[in-house]
Amino acid sequence: KMTKSRQKGDKHQTIMGKRYYKNDIVDICIRDYLTLPKYLKDCLKGYKVGLEFEEKEVSLDPYALGYWLGDGDKTTFHITTIEKEVIEYFNKYAKENGLQLTRGKEGTKNEITYHITTGMIGGSNYNRNPFLNSLKKYNLIRNKHIPEQYKINSRQSRLKLLAGLIDSDGYYNRQSNAIEITQKVKPLAKDILFLVRSLGMRGTVKECEKSCMYKGEKK
């Protein structure tokens, strides 16, 4: 994609015999790009285009899955949050599926764990929870990843999935002007990278070390 001209007052650049203006899209192969002089290379910036897939039916709302992947219990459908909007969303979604959102224990950062249950006690009712059954269906119990049905789905579905991941496990880095998601599960990190790039966004992965202070000790 063309950026501002190198020479002051220039309104266009000629590339491979064609005239281009600022913000024009230049469709050029790598071989031809490498033959360009440096000043023309400096005028061109990478332009990413998202992938389009047909919509596929899934048994768990993409946002709900994204939120669980980011901050849910890997063994069942429990989530931890203090965000009012998130609590309202899951409460509404649970009711629409004949389930209940119940409040559990409070964490060290005033975060509260919420359980999505059938509201009935007994082992036989364990398998009546459609949320939990969906996790089993997509082989997600103790195996967090983005199922193929969600990775190769409509743009709207993938955006909702990414929104859930960001709301649960992401934050805005002002210094780099980017959204960062810290994820220790490597297969899931790779899936998130694919998701971001499939939507036409720039995504990178790098290793980092996270720590916190607890009772004067670094953990």
For each of these PLM feature ranges, what is it?
Residues 1-214:
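Intein-associated homing endonuclease modules of the LAGLIDADG/DOD-type, together
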Residues 215-219:
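Short, intrinsically disordered, charge-balanced linker/junction segments flanking boundaries
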